[in-house]
Each structure stands twice: as structure tokens, then as C-alpha cells.
Amino acid sequence: PVLLAAWLSFSMSEVRGLTKSKSINGEYITIREVVVDVGKETKRKDMGKTPTRNRRHRIPPYIKELIDKVDGDVLVPISGRALYHRWIKLQDENGMAHITFHDLRHLSASIMALLRIPDKYAQERGGWKSDKVMKKVYMQTFSEEREKVDNIIDSYFEKIVEPEEDG
């Protein structure tokens, strides 16, 4: 779940809505549903907050390997509360200062800025609809340029999750 948020800029409700049957198509993952907790009830919805949130990303090979290891259809079959507590525990076990799960989307945006990903592509990847959050996407992106952007971001994260061995 953490890599889906930090690497692909998915929110907790988007991560919880991912399924192998509806979200995965070949080497792409698409936000088709979200899962939210309303009181004590869990609700699966066909759409995120806005149409721009229903977006598609190429699945980085490292994340694809993790997805392939998941039993069943639902990629993250736990409640929002359980996910939150596991995230806090992971931070504690690794001596990290606490950040919220949502902060991982901010991290994703910051990493894209650090890598000098054009705002237009960063906004598309993050699913932000207005320039008050990022910048508006009015023009279509070119798939060749988008592929270059995806390669830059994938390369950055792959170096983190698969560090080169010394010697």
C-alpha cells in the first residue's frame, strides 16, 4: 500500500479499491473503484472524488511482483483503520517520524518536482483537477512523453527498492 501511495500517488481509498479483476489490465493499473469507511460501514464506490482521479499508470515491475504475490482479488483487503495502524507500526519499527498515509501523496508530488517532472504530467499522475492543487490539465499529454516520465519515476523508486550490491 505504501508504494502505491508514494510511487503512483494513490490515496488510501484508491489503494483499498484496487482489484486484480477490475484494476489490472496487462502492464497497467487503473483506478476504477474506491473503498471508503462511512461510520462503521465500508462502501465500495465506482468513482473517486472527481473524474480526474480515475487514472491509469503503467505498473512498475517491482510493484507488479508484489501484486502477483497477493492472494485473492482485492489487493489490500483490510480496513482503513487497520491500514493506518500498520502504517504507524511500520514507521515505529523503522525509527521514522510519523507521517499520515495521505502525506505519501505529498511525498509523491515532491519527488516528481525533485525529478523535474513537468507539472502537467505530475498532475495527471496524481489525479489533481485544479491548479490550486497542482496546475490544470487542459491539453492531452503525448503518450511517448508520458512513457519517458514514467521511466524516470520508475527508475528513481527501483533504485530505492532494489539497491545495487557492492562489488
Language model feature labels by segment:
Residues L3-E33, K120:
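Short, charged phosphate-coordinating catalytic segments
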Residues G39, R44-Y62, N151-G167:
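C-terminal secondary-structure termini that scaffold catalytic or DNA-interacting sites
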Residues V35, K64, G126-N151:
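Catalytic-site neighborhood detector that most strongly recognizes the C-terminal catalytic loop/helix
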Residues P1, A5, M112-A113:
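Short helix-to-turn junction characteristic of helix-turn-helix DNA-binding domains
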Residues S23-Y28, I117-V137:
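Short, polar N-cap/turn motifs at the start of nucleic acid-interacting alpha helices
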